[in-house]
Every structure is written in C-alpha cells, then in structure tokens.
Amino acid sequence: MPTSSATPAILPIAAVSQLAFRDAMSGLAAAVNLITTDGPGGRAGFTATAVCSVTDQPPTLLVCINRSASVYDAFIENGTLCVNTLGNGQQDLSNLFGGKSSQQERFAGGQWEAGVTGAPVLDSAKLALDCKVSQSVSVGTHDILFCEVVDIRHQSGADALVYFGRRYHHLPSETPAA
C-alpha cells in the first residue's frame, strides 16, 4: 500500500471570543477560595476559583493570578500563599476579597493567624493549604503559580461553597442515606 509523505493542510481555526469563553467557563462548578499572602511584599488577598491539584509528589497545586491585579506584586515578592477554601455562609467574605475594598478591609472581615509560611490562614476556612511558590508560568494575562503545599488544615463536616452559573451554591459535606 503506498504511503504519502505529504503533510495534511492545517486549516485556520477561528478564535473563540472572550465572551463565549467566559460564558462556557461559568458552566464549570468550582470551590471558592481566598488566596492570601504576607511578607516583605505586604499582606494581600483575593478571591479565586482558578485553583487545582497538580501532583501529590511533591504535593503541588496551582493558582492563577492576573498580572494586572493590585495584589500581584505582593504574591510574587512574598513567594508564599495560603489557599483558604470557603464554606457555606461565607459569600460575603468572598465578595469582600473579590471587590475593590482595601486589603485592610478585606482582612478585617475574618479571623486570621499566620501559617507555617507566614501566609494568613482563615480560622473558619473549610480547608487551608499553606504553600511556597515553586514556579511561575505566564499565559496570556495571567501567571500560573505552582505551589508546593507545606501544611494542611481542615474542618471536618464543614459544608462547601461553590461558584457555578455566576452564582454561589451550597454543597453539603455529607449526603443523607436514602
């Protein structure tokens, strides 16, 4: 059977619009997290759903941060962060960290203690993953921070807060038996 060494033509692919992409991403449910840092670059925090596991050897997760965000320099200079996963009833705190309020106002909304890395850990977080940033990769408008987890704190039985369809939703920690 004859073989062809010709390379198939690659047709141009139309770019997806920013609006279409955002609409599509609103269909992905995600945990709501406060990403916090403290150190020489200052104390800072923001709300994020762009967080996910990378590997368990070493335990590593990723966080995406916009390079134009007011908190960007603090995170890069400090090189540490804590992923504080929010529970049901903490929508106001999420909105506070996701809005235009000052860093002082944001942190006044909760009770905090310093984690192993010095990053602020929210006392009432469903889960807190204290991390050191091990690598950063730039893609488009954002940096992807790869973060090695050095300490974990969690509250068993705490209900989760998720964001889906541009709204907050309550996710019970346990499903009652049928």
Swiss-Prot record:
Swiss-Prot/TrEMBL GO biological process terms: nitrogen utilization; uracil catabolic process
Enzyme class at the top of the EC tree: oxidoreductase
Superkingdom assignment: Bacteria
Keywords on record: Flavoprotein, FMN, NAD, Oxidoreductase
Keyword NAD: yes
GO molecular function, one term: FMN binding
EC number: 1.5.1.42
Keyword NAD belongs to the record: yes
Pfam families: Flavin_Reduct
Catalysed reaction, written as an equation: FMNH2 + NAD(+) = FMN + NADH + 2 H(+)
Protein task: Catalyzes the reduction of FMN to FMNH2 which is used to reduce pyrimidine by RutA via the Rut pathway.
Family: Belongs to the non-flavoprotein flavin reductase family. RutF subfamily.
Annotated protein name in UniProt: FMN reductase (NADH) RutF
